[in-house]
Regions:
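Short, charged, amphipathic alpha-helices and their helix-cap/turn boundaries
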Residues: 156-162, 197-212, 268
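Bacterial Sec-dependent N-terminal signal peptides
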Residues: 1-21
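C-terminal beta-rich recognition modules with glycine/proline-rich loops and embedded aromatic residues
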Residues: 309, 375-383, 388-486, 506-529, ...
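Helix-capping and short linker residues that terminate individual alpha-solenoid repeat units
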Residues: 122, 138-142, 195, 211-215, ...
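Flexible glycine/proline-rich, aromatic-decorated loop/lid segments
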Residues: 264-266, 320-339
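Aromatic-lined substrate-binding rim segments of carbohydrate-active enzymes
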Residues: 125-141
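Aromatic (Trp/Tyr) and acidic
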Residues: 21-124, 128, 158-193, 228-245, ...
């Protein structure tokens, strides 16, 4: 019997793998996170370590402290004791103890992040802890698969956002389908990381409940998600299981957008998705929807979806994209602004929105194979995403402004510095799941093409033509541009190695006219195999090496990494007369604490600045200490006295990577530095 069970399990896994291969959809395949091990004590190794040691334990502890787990326990109790006397008491009035109707997702997202971490740091205790959490999650699931504690705890008095009946206010506030999306994503990650289907079965039961009850057929609730993410999660579930019903439901949720009861720009429901050409509304919802459209387009071949997301992508990177890779100009509605509406001091740039852009840019690359999408993804990763989490993994930004006066309370909960948690904890828990997933963005494969998209110390085992290639990458990126790729094992023989040459090296900051380099620096790079220059070609931003590879072959890559200055399109009013400073993939900023003898808002950059790069140790609050490459430049401090007379004195400005600011408390910060008198202090 045991032998038969093992055989059936092997057959199931084989069929699942075949289904995944058959239905992936994208012309280019992402190398999964399970195949890439990030090297410890490297730039990204440190971040994954911080996620493991600090962020994820913190998130789990917050789930314990803030009633998240207890919500599942209470829902389970009600299921086991229908109509119990407690339901009539204030202690069981959901709105009095549950902050938001989507609080369940913090549990799911943290499990997802922990699952990714297990790939780099196997941990039996963590595995067992996750299993214990899944016990209480599963106990809260209703017999038909519905899992939404905001209602199940007390069906007669649910959370005030939940509505009286299932799906009744899904398009407004309930977040029932948003909860489903994060549950499915987490369950897929958990299955891929552990091989256990415990969470996957819970998620499938809820997805099956949704398929039964939400749709266009008679008797179904014809609604679409108020907050998108279920679309790409269901597509992921289809790819994992091969079950067509999940893809069909994902497509329904997209096809009926703009056709149901609610139609507004805020939730991108003002018109059908195929008619949308610009990025509008709540930036996180939008980004998740666009990523879901890409998934469904890849899996179904829907040309309408492809045309729409191509147009939306172009609108974002041409008119609504911050130099830091963030999106969402407005605090009101956490939303995209109008074309070229990119304020600095009051910019929103939610951390979750930056993460959603990584999802979109990755998918655009998998569809089209052009390095420009990875250029955008890299910019967002190194600036707009990691800025949202302190280097030690324990404090967070909800928004990410490009300037701060130390007074304007830009951060969530009306604060001006990084916080250990938020009442609405979507950003910390999202970082929990995203940072450890970074290995899955490193490489991609198409037929016999192996794409090297990102640069970070790692060892990867990659399938090419069904054969293993083990590739080791050694680098100090992003601090310098030297990368060594070593073939540690090759069963695939000849294949094409495609190495991305970043746009910041020899082209432009972004693939549009929104930003341009304003200096006359000529970027240069070299790529050699075993110390020898090789004949090659450039294709879509990739350096292509066609070769019969042997074990021990070393590809040496060098990207010059000079300091560059950037100007914005004149249509961006807030950046007129200003320049931004970059080095490699990192955007820099000036922070008051490094420049205490003058007001950085009144520092005037010279027309032809001369930069120096030096090592700097940042000694942050709460024993957070880390090293960066700082940039110094000579300029003028412009002062106006009581009589209105202007004077200028020479000063030396220090700049640090944007992600590193606010580790030493609140204060002045500026990304876009004035280069003309008219731009000084215009906040």
């Amino acid at each position: 019997m045991k032998r038969l069970t093992t055989l059936m399990l092997s057959l199931t896994l084989m069929l699942s793998a075949q289904a995944q291969q058959r239905t992936n959809g994208y012309p280019i395949s992402q190398v999964p996170f399970t195949a890439v091990k990030i090297t410890p004590n490297t730039f990204w190794g440190d971040r994954i370590y911080a996620a493991r040691e600090v962020t994820i334990p913190l998130a789990f502890s917050k789930c314990e402290e803030t009633h998240r787990y207890e919500n599942f326990n209470m829902a389970a109790y009600t299921l086991q004791h229908p109509g119990h006397e407690g339901l009539k008491t204030p202690q069981w009035d959901v709105s009095k103890f549950m902050g938001f109707s989507f609080d369940d997702t913090d549990v799911y997202k943290t499990i997802e992040g922990a699952s990714y971490v297990l790939q780099t740091y196997p941990d039996k205790k963590l595995t067992a802890y996750i299993d214990s959490v899944l016990d209480i999650v599963g106990a809260a699931q209703e017999p038909d698969g519905y899992l939404y504690t905001a209602r199940t705890i007390n069906p007669e008095h649910p959370h005030h956002w939940a509505g009286k009946k299932r799906w009744e206010v899904e398009e407004i506030l309930s977040h029932e389908l948003y909860n489903l999306g994060h549950m499915v994503d987490a369950a897929c990650a958990h299955y891929q990381a552990t091989g256990s289907d415990k969470f996957l079965n819970i998620a499938k039961r809820y997805a099956d409940c949704v398929i039964k009850e939400v749709g266009s057929k008679e008797g179904q609730a014809c609604v679409v998600p108020g907050h998108q993410i279920a679309e790409m999660a269901l597509a992921r579930l289809y790819v994992l299981t091969g079950e067509q019903k999940y893809l069909d439901e994902a497509k329904f949720l997209l096809d009926y957008r703009g056709k149901t009861g609610r139609r507004d720009i805020y939730s991108q429901s003002d018109k059908p998705v195929v008619d949308q050409k610009e990025a509008w509304g709540h930036a996180v919802r939008a980004g998740y929807m666009y990523a879901g459209m890409a998934d469904v387009a890849a899996l179904t071949g829907d040309e309408g979806y492809l045309k729409a997301i191509d147009a939306i992508y172009n609108n974002i990177v041409s008119k609504k994209y911050y130099i830091t890779g963030g999106v969402g100009a407005r605090h009101a509605g956490e939303a995209f602004g109008a074309d070229y509406e990119l304020p600095n001091l009051t910019s929103y740039n939610e951390t979750c929105a930056a993460i959603s852009m990584v999802y979109l840019f990755q998918r655009m690359f998998l569809l089209h194979g052009d390095s420009k999408y990875i250029d955008c993804m890299e910019r967002t990763l190194y600036n707009g995403v990691i800025s949202g989490m302190s280097v030690d993994g324990g404090r967070f930004f909800y928004p990410n402004p490009l300037a701060s006066d130390g007074k304007y309370a830009f951060n969530a909960d009306n604060t001006v510095e990084r916080q250990p948690w938020f009442g609405c904890a979507c950003c910390p828990s999202n970082l929990c799941r995203f940072i450890p997933s970074f290995p899955g963005y490193m490489y991609a494969v198409k037929d016999r093409d192996l794409y090297v998209n990102l640069f970070a110390g790692n060892t990867a085992t990659i399938k090419i033509g069904g054969k293993d290639v083990i590739l080791e990458q050694i680098t100090n990126y992003p601090w310098d541009g030297d990368i060594a790729l070593t073939i540690k094992k090759n069963q695939a023989k000849a294949f094409n190695l495609k190495i991305r040459v970043p746009g910041w090296v020899d082209r432009s900051p972004v693939p549009s006219d929104l930003y341009r380099f304003s200096d006359d620096v000529l970027g240069n790079y070299s790529i050699k195999v075993n110390g020898q220059v090789v004949k090659t070609e450039m294709a879509n931003g990739f350096f292509v090496i066609k070769r019969l590879w042997k074990k021990g072959d070393v590809v040496s890559i060098h990207f010059d990494m000079p300091v560059r200055t950037v100007k914005a399109n004149p249509a961006v009013v807030d950046d007129r007369g200003r320049i931004a400073v970059e080095r490699g993939p990192l955007v820099y900023c000036a922070e008051g604490i490094d420049n205490q003898d003058f007001n950085i808002f009144n520092f005037l950059m010279p027309r032809q600045p001369r930069f120096e790069v030096n090592d700097l140790q940042i000694n942050g609050n709460r024993q957070v200490t880390f090293n960066v490459k700082a940039i110094q430049v000579e300029g003028q401090f412009v002062n106006t006295d009581e009589k209105g007379e202007i004077s200028a004195t020479h000063r030396r400005l220090t700049m640090i990577p944007y992600y590193a600011w606010n580790h030493r408390g609140p204060g002045l910060m500026e990304v876009w530095m004035p280069q003309s008198i008219s731009a000084l202090g215009n906040y």
